[in-house]
Regions:
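A generic structural motif
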Residues: 28, 36-38, 69, 77, ...
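Short, acidic/hydrophobic/Gly-rich beta-strand patch recurrent on exposed beta strands
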Residues: 22-25, 31-34, 61-66, 109-111
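Extracytoplasmic/periplasmic cell wall- or extracellular glycan-interacting regions that localize
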Residues: 1-51, 56, 119, 125-128
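Zn2+-dependent peptidoglycan hydrolase active-site motif and core
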Residues: 43-78
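Feature marks short, surface-exposed loop/turn motifs that line or immediately flank catalytic pockets
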Residues: 18, 70, 116
Length: 128
C-alpha cells in the first residue's frame, strides 16, 4: 500500500460524480483530499518529476513518473517544491496544498495512472 500524499479528508471520489460547481456529472479520474492551506504534499513513491507547472483546470500540477508506466499527479498546489528532472523519494515534500484548481477550496487533487488509464487511488493508498 502507498502512503497518503497529504493528511485530510477525501471529499470527492474516483468515478462518476456530480460536479459541485457545474451541477453536471463527470467521470473523475482521481480523488480530492481537503487539507489545511499550505499542507505539505508528499510523493507516494520514488520517481522522476516529468511536469511541474500550471495546467488549465488543475492549477499548479506536479506529475511524477514511477517507471513501468506508472504515474502520480498532484494538482491544485499553492507552491511547487520540485522541478522537472528531479528524482524524488517516497515521502518527499514536493509541493504545498492550495486552491489553484476549479473546486474553490483548499484541496489536493490526486490521480494515479497505469499507462494512459486512471486507476482508483483509494485501491492503492494505505487504509486509515
Amino acid at each position: 500500500m502507498l502512503p497518503w500524499p497529504v493528511e485530510g479528508k477525501v471529499v470527492s471520489f474516483f468515478g462518476r460524480q456530480k460536479h459541485p460547481t457545474f451541477d453536471t456529472y463527470v467521470q473523475r479520474k482521481g480523488i480530492e483530499i481537503r487539507a489545511s492551506e499550505g499542507s505539505l504534499i508528499h510523493a507516494v513513491m520514488p520517481g522522476s518529476v516529468v511536469y511541474s507547472d500550471w495546467l488549465k483546470g488543475y492549477g499548479l500540477v506536479i506529475i511524477v513518473d514511477h517507471a513501468n508506466g506508472f504515474f502520480s499527479l498532484y494538482a491544485h498546489a499553492s507552491k511547487i517544491l520540485t522541478r522537472v528532472g528531479e528524482q524524488v523519494v517516497e515521502g518527499q515534500a514536493i509541493g504545498e496544498t492550495g486552491d489553484t484548481g476549479m473546486i474553490g477550496e483548499n484541496t489536493l487533487y490526486f490521480e494515479l495512472r497505469e499507462g494512459a488509464e486512471p486507476v482508483d487511488p483509494l485501491q492503492w493508498l494505505a487504509k486509515r
